[in-house]
């Protein structure tokens, strides 16, 4: 596959975020358009239907802030259900808790998981093992 360097833009309520880089994969699944782009500053980034999801650069800030406040607020941490999270980052953070014996990740779009495992495996880390 030939990789294409281009600009990808996300638009939201009168604002625009542009990202220049090499498109590693652009695929339409049954549910959405999935893009992984390699950017000089952010590293690899995942976009779904034109919306920024995560990147190597900001992954830890998003997933750590999503998981740790929630899990720190409960005493019994044995089973976790993740709805969405096909990039694996939320599950990766949950794996850090030894009290958790079971993590169920439910993602409607199996292509997001397949693409994340191939192009963004560092984000899922230990969760994919």
Identify what each model region corresponds to.
Residues 1-45:
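N-terminal auxiliary segments of SAM/dcSAM-dependent transferases
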Residues 2-8, 54-129:
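The AdoMet/dcAdoMet-binding core of the Class I SAM-like
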